[in-house]
Amino acid sequence: MKYFKDIPEVKYEGPQSDNPFAFKYYNPDEIIDGKPLKDHLRFAIAYWHTFCATGSDPFGQPTIVRPWDKFSNRMDNAKARVEAAFEFFELLDVPFFCFHDRDIAPEGENLKESNKNLDEIVSLIKEYLKTSKTKVLWGTANLFSHPRYVHGAATSCNADVFAYAAAQVKKALEVTKELGGENYVFWGGREGYETLLNTDMGLELDNLARFLHMAVEYAKEIGFDGQFLIEPKPKEPTKHQYDFDSAHVYGFLKKYDLDKYFKLNIEVNHATLAGHDFHHELRFARINNMLGSIDANMGDLLLGWDTDQFPTDVRLTTLAMYEVIKAGGFDKGGLNFDAKVRRGSFELEDLVIGHIAGMDAFAKGFKIAYKLVKDGVFDKFIDERYKSYKEGIGAKIVSGEANFKMLEEYALSLDKIENKSGKQELLEMILNKYMFSE
């Protein structure tokens, strides 16, 4: 069955095109710095938002009814989603997709039935993968939707829940490996607390670390060589989540000797909820060699929740790709569109248009960022700004030679201290120049 039969295959037509079903800036085969643009960006489709979302919210019923959800049997719907998904991947010519275990196959009455459902759908996906150019960027387990996870999964107060979550991740790891996934993601939506009055934070954090170490060991056991990723988010659905932001996760991984196994999967809207620019989260991850992958979306700064909008802000995408390029590009990671159409955008074509808009925005951002990096615009300014640490007393501070007594003696010899302007306005002007002239 053709679900998108009324929508033409999406091709690159250039910035002058008015065709809503064409790329304006994303030319997948355009060679930049020796490789195609598609290999720089490594776009992925999020299975959950794209094929499972219904448009429901806490105040209203579903507004989105997809043609692949027409069956009364949940497994029939799951099989239809697979067919629709691979048609969609081909329509946009995307290289990757991402999934939760419960996105692709429904939860059963017990773990055995859930695993049976998963095996059946995985077998079907494997058949499609044989002839598809699209691969799996990452897989994960949904450890937040079912009521059993009301108090968390790895951080649950109930050891039975911990055990069930471990079994679910075990299976999800096996499935991700079976499908050729390049990464495996942990997102702790229920790993946190609502109140400290009933919480043993120390035990919960220790148990979370134990859980992750078990995952690392099992991955070695089955020969899964994909990259483990943790996705920070400060809140929602839980009041306080332990993977609050990049710095929190980095500190946690360091404390529990997990940093050698994990990198970060950073989402735009999660950075917003943590009170950070996306640029900040990426910069922190990059300078600590923790930048693994990106969940590409954006939020509404006037709202206090995760809106998961398609990323259309070119300044945001430019600064994001600047950090990715400075990090040496993606290794096993990529740009996963963890984005959903608005509740009022319920037509099938809106799904396609949303992804085109996001892919164009990141393609444009990459091209601008590449030129900024190549020209050394910000690097030159930063080198000049911090040059006092390359000679004299500054060099001694950096080398570790300086101590308080030496620095006091030096400070006493100073007549006066002169600072120079940070030139923020100039740098923002230059950024705009590159954005508008590219």
UniProtKB/Swiss-Prot annotation:
Residues binding Mg(2+): D306, D308
Cofactor(s) listed: Mg(2+)
Keywords: Carbohydrate metabolism, Cytoplasm, Isomerase, Magnesium, Metal-binding, Xylose metabolism
One function term, GO molecular function aspect: xylose isomerase activity
Note on cofactor: Binds 2 magnesium ions per subunit.
Reactions mediated catalytically: alpha-D-xylose = alpha-D-xylulofuranose
Entry's family note: Belongs to the xylose isomerase family.
Subunit structure, interactors included: Homotetramer.
This protein's name: Xylose isomerase
